[in-house]
């Protein structure tokens, strides 16, 4: 069964986007998962992923935006594992594409690790860049698990800061933490995770996430209610048991006939009906119905009398 993160990424790879927004998505995918090698005095761009749908997405976006045909190379990561590594390899127009995506400075040939200013200026480009970043190195827990968590990993601090800035532009209350090998921006609140999925275009995944979250919260609420009712029931049972013990004590040591009429009446009734509620006891009173609080008052009085007789024996 596919993980929830895989379902999110599959949906994202099927979105149709405007060429300018496709550039922002590509910029994130290449900046985060790409590597350059020099072959025959020219750059070769390799973009790696373990997800075949993401590899197809990268291939399609390059062809859509830049009209270049990339090569798709497949490697098995380890002989004993089924995992494959998919490499989208581009050998033509690499310099121009990387320059256009603000990854490579054409004059100095320096690589930029920051989110492009052109992306930060326009909300739809930010959405697309975040989509590419999530496809490149994002993960999200199944909403049915014990904790909600979504994160995007960045190798560089300045790039991580850009991701954080964009996410909080959409009021996601994102946070960041440094790891030994890099940095992550993360979300812990269920509502913010759902909002992020909406921001990057994973509408179906967002709806599924919300459905599961609501059902989970409902189950938790029901469980809390049941636990509360059970606790109250246990308290009621304990109280009734204590009442019966005290009434029996009075019966054996004092005699119920020696009690005031109202207390004698409730004592006899409680012994005859040990399992009924206070409200039901009140309705059964031979001398006339009384309220739940009236029943409770008389039973408390019986408890006080019994405890008063018991104290000298305990001393």
UniProtKB/Swiss-Prot annotation:
Q: Give the GO terms filed under biological process for this record.
A: cell division; regulation of sporulation
UniProt keywords, alphabetically: Cell cycle, Cell division, DNA-binding
InterPro entries associated with the record = Homing_endonucl, Sporu_reg_WhiA_N_dom, Sporulation_regulator_WhiA, Sporulation_regulator_WhiA_C, WhiA_LAGLIDADG_dom
**Where in the chain is the DNA-binding region found?**
277-311
MF annotations from Gene Ontology: DNA binding
Gene3D superfamilies attached to this UniProt entry: Homing endonucleases (3.10.28.10)
The record's listing under Pfam families reads: HTH_WhiA, LAGLIDADG_WhiA, WhiA_N
> Which protein family is named in the record?
Belongs to the WhiA family.
User: HAMAP family of this UniProt entry?
Assistant: HTH_type_WhiA
Please give the function described in this protein's UniProt entry. Involved in cell division and chromosome segregation.
Q: What is this protein called?
A: Probable cell division protein WhiA
This chain's source organism reads: Lacticaseibacillus casei (strain BL23)
């Amino acid at each position: 069964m596919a993980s929830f993160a895989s379902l999110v990424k599959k949906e994202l790879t099927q979105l149709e986007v405007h060429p300018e927004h496709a550039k922002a998505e590509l910029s994130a995918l290449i900046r985060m998962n790409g590597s350059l090698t020099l072959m025959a005095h020219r750059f070769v761009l390799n973009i790696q992923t373990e997800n075949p749908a993401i590899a197809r997405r990268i291939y399609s976006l390059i062809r859509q935006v830049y009209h270049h045909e990339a090569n798709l190379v497949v490697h098995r990561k380890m002989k004993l594992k089924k995992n494959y590594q998919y490499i989208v390899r581009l050998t033509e127009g690499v310099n121009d594409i990387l320059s256009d995506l603000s990854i490579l400075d054409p004059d100095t040939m320096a690589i930029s690790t920051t989110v492009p200013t052109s992306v930060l200026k326009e909300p739809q480009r930010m959405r697309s860049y975040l989509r590419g970043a999530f496809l490149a190195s994002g993960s999200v827990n199944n909403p049915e698990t014990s904790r909600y968590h979504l994160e995007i990993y960045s190798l560089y601090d300045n790039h991580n800061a850009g991701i954080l800035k964009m996410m909080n532009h959409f009021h996601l209350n994102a946070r960041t933490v440094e790891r030994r090998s890099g940095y992550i921006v993360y979300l812990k609140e269920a509502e913010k995770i759902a909002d992020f999925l909406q921001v990057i275009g994973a509408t179906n995944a967002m709806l599924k996430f919300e459905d599961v979250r609501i059902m989970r919260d409902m189950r938790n609420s029901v469980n809390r209610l049941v636990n509360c009712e059970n606790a109250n029931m246990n308290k009621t049972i304990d109280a009734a048991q204590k009442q019966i013990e005290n009434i029996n004590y009075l019966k054996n040591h004092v005699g119920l006939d020696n009690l005031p009429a109202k207390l004698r009446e409730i004592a006899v009734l409680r012994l005859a009906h040990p399992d009924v509620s206070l409200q039901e006891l009140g309705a059964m009173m031979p001398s006339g119905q009384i309220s739940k609080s009236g029943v409770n008052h008389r039973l408390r009085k019986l408890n006080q009398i019994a405890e008063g007789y018991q104290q000298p024996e305990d001393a």
